[in-house]
Amino acid sequence: MKISEEEVRHVANLSKLRFSDQETKEFASSLSKIVDMIELLNEVDTEGVPVTTTMADRKTVMREDIAQPGHNRDDLFKNVPQHQDYYIKVPAILEDGGDA
């Protein structure tokens, strides 16, 4: 399946990203190859193969949930350059304030 440069531009725009024409062309090519590989994997016969949900040993996956005291909020904010009502203030990264 071919991913077009227009599709890459559309998704980039939705993500508030900008790419050069060369980058857009390279992304379209790379994404097309990835989709082709996934389509190839979909052709593999997995009938009768047990479902694998994890490769980790499940013996230690969960632990007892024990409440522990946290850090002193005032101590945590000592090194914060700007804050208001225990929120850290950071510079805006979107010129128009954005909708994110």
Curated annotation (Swiss-Prot):
A matching Pfam family: GatC
Reaction it catalyzes: L-glutamyl-tRNA(Gln) + L-glutamine + ATP + H2O = L-glutaminyl-tRNA(Gln) + L-glutamate + ADP + phosphate + H(+); L-aspartyl-tRNA(Asn) + L-glutamine + ATP + H2O = L-asparaginyl-tRNA(Asn) + L-glutamate + ADP + phosphate + 2 H(+)
Enzyme class: ligase
GO-annotated molecular function: asparaginyl-tRNA synthase (glutamine-hydrolyzing) activity; ATP binding; glutaminyl-tRNA synthase (glutamine-hydrolyzing) activity
Enzyme Commission designation: 6.3.5.-
This protein's UniProt keywords: ATP-binding, Ligase, Nucleotide-binding, Protein biosynthesis
InterPro entries: Asp/Glu-ADT_sf_sub_c (IPR036113), GatC (IPR003837)
Quaternary structure (record): Heterotrimer of A, B and C subunits.
NCBIfam families: gatC
Protein name: Aspartyl/glutamyl-tRNA(Asn/Gln) amidotransferase subunit C
Species of origin: Streptococcus agalactiae serotype V (strain ATCC BAA-611 / 2603 V/R)
Encoding gene (name): gatC
